[in-house]
Amino acid sequence: MSEKIVKLKEGIEGLFIKNQRFNTTSISFNFYLPLKKENVAENALLPFILTSSGKDYPSFSALNFKLSKLYGARLDASTEKYGDCQLLRMTISVIDDRFTFDSDSLVKQASELLLGLIFNPNAENGEFSENDVKREKRKAIEHIKGEIAEKRIYAKNRLISEMYKASPYGLPKCGTVEMVEKSQAKVFMPLGKICYPPLFCVFT
């Protein structure tokens, strides 16, 4: 296995991890944002909204059809805490080019798809689709309630919130149910402008 960090352009770095043992390639875009109470819930929704549709694929079915044409590529999104930062991660996984018959690189097509979803979102006049926002807010609330119902996870989260009361790290990574309900995530915020530099891309 080999690793290499490459400066792709100003403010963007790529981490390339090469390992012939794996049959798939994953491309991840990682955005580090300041962890703040006033927008933790809104930020947490962003990767899920962005990977559910795009300007070129305005519906979930259209996006799924595109993924099926890429040999069943898979999109994933997550929100984590990393110190006093909120980490938003969006990933696409595809079969490695070694195992395809297409003349055009499958990894290249997958990278372009993910880039399009992130930087050319399904937004009109600066606002996301209302249906997309409602759906992801509902899923986020279900996720938060699920963690509350899971005693070990709830106890761990409560311990962290008490230990780090005076620090941003004490905030829940996705906010609370009340925060999600009140969030104004309908407004599109260009991640490249609000995240800490550098934007980190991981290719494995």
Language model regions located:
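Glycine-rich, charged/polar anion/phosphate-binding loops
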Residues: 12-16, 187-190
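Short, polar/flexible loop-turn hinges at active-site or ligand-entry regions and domain interfaces
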Residues: 53-56, 97-101, 120-129
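Non-catalytic alpha-helical coupling and interface elements of nucleotide-dependent molecular machines
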Residues: 51, 72, 116-119, 123, ...
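Active-site SXXK
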Residues: 43-51
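Scaffold signal of the M16-like zinc-metallopeptidase fold and its non-catalytic homologs
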Residues: 141-197
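Acidic/histidine-enriched alpha-helical segments
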Residues: 64, 120-144
